[in-house]
């Protein structure tokens, strides 16, 4: 499915969300099993925190750059629905880039040059970042704002 053009954007959206969840886990626990996390076995090795951050920065850049604004979308998107409830691809792109910005800020004390490189790149295209509450990432079901899950607010 990953190489099937009809699912191109949906795969990238899933990867953006996967990286968001991994970013939450790494910020809480530090090094975690990421590179082999989904392989069967009891003894999955832990990855270094810095390696995970670099991998997420690369993954999110590839996802944001790879989204095709006229491509496929989820028919029902509980996070960034458009007016028709399908995926709002521009908001997914903004989310991926804003998450990259957050990760770059997190690594600035450990690798200032990498952090500066990423931040400078993102600020050159500030229109591709979350800029208002309309861009917020909220996991919500239905039309009722009270049905959102506050754990996933970004």
Name every feature range the model reports, one short phrase each.
Residues 1-154:
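Structured, solvent-exposed acidic/aromatic patches
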């Amino acid at each position: 499915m990953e190489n099937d053009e009809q699912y191109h954007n949906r795969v990238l959206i899933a990867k953006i969300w996967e990286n968001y969840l991994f970013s939450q886990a790494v910020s809480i626990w530090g090094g975690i099993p990421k590179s082999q996390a989904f392989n069967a076995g009891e003894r999955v090795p832990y990855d270094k925190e810095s390696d995970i951050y670099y991998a997420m920065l690369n993954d999110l850049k590839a996802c944001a750059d790879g989204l095709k604004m006229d491509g496929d979308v989820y028919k029902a998107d509980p996070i960034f629905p458009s007016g028709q409830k399908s995926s709002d691809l521009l908001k997914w792109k903004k989310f991926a880039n804003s998450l990259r910005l957050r990760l770059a800020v997190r690594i600035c004390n450990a690798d200032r040059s990498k952090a500066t490189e990423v931040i400078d790149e993102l600020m050159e295209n500030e229109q591709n970042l979350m800029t208002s509450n309309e861009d917020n990432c909220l996991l919500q079901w239905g039309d009722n704002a009270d049905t959102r899950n506050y754990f996933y607010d970004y």
